From Swiss-Prot:
This is Cell division protein ZapD. The keyword Cell cycle applies. It holds the Pfam family ZapD. Cell division factor that enhances FtsZ-ring assembly. Directly interacts with FtsZ and promotes bundling of FtsZ protofilaments, with a reduction in FtsZ GTPase activity. It comes from Janthinobacterium sp. (strain Marseille) (Minibacterium massiliensis).
Amino acid sequence: MIVYEYPFNERIRTLLRLEDLYEKFAFFIGQDHPQHHHVALATMFEMLEVAGRADLKSDLLQELERQKQTLLGFKSNPNVEAEMLDAILFDLDRISAALIASQGKTGQHIRENEWLMSIRGRTIIPGGACEFDLPSYYAWQHDSAEQRLADIHKWFTPLAPLFDAIGMVLRLLRESGRPVKMIAQTGSYQQMLQGKAYQMLRLNIDEALGAIPEISANKYMLWIRFTSQDGDMKPKAFEGDVPFELSLCSF
C-alpha cells in the first residue's frame, strides 16, 4: 500500500515539508561517504529555510499544550488504556520542556557560524561547492567519517527539540483519522465536508493498481482524480474504478 497525505492548510504543509527534510537528513547521516554528508548538510540548510518562514516554536508549544489538555480529559474514561495515555502525556511534557529550553531563534547557531554560512551560500549555486570554491570544506570532507558525523550531529542537536515536536504533532494528527473504504467511480471521487475544519487527509491505495491520486480540497469539498503514468508520458485519467481507504484527520 502507498499512503498519500494532503494538508488542508499552510501550517500542516510546513510541518510535512520539514518532516520530509528530516527523513532525508536522517538517511544521509546514516551513511559514511563524504557525498552523503554533503547532502545531509545541504538538507539541514533547507530545514532552516523552511523553518524560518514562520514562528514554529510558539505554534508547536501551543498545539502540544492543547493536545495535553484534550488527553487529560480522557483520564477518567474507563475505555481508555491508562498506561498508553500516561505514556503519551509523558512524551508531551518531555518534548514541550525540551522545546521551551531551546534558546533563541530556530537555527540561530548555524546562522552565526560564518563557515557554515559560506557553505550554504555556495550550495545554492549549481556546482558551487567545488574544491576550488570552498577549499576548507573540501578538506573537511576528507576528515574521517566519524569526525564529519560528530560535527553534523553537533550542528543539528539544537534543532532536535523542534523536530521532536513536529513528529509528535503529526503523529497525533495522523492517529485522529479513521480509515474508511471508498471507491472512485471511473477514477473520480468527490465528498462534501460541510465546513468541518480538517487539517489533513490520508489516502491508502494498492500500488499494484497503478492509480495516482491528484487531490484538491477546502473546508467544503474534497476532490480526488486518479491518473496513471506510462513511462515518460504525461499522466492521463485513470480508466476504471479505484478502491482506496480515506482518513480525514483533525485535532
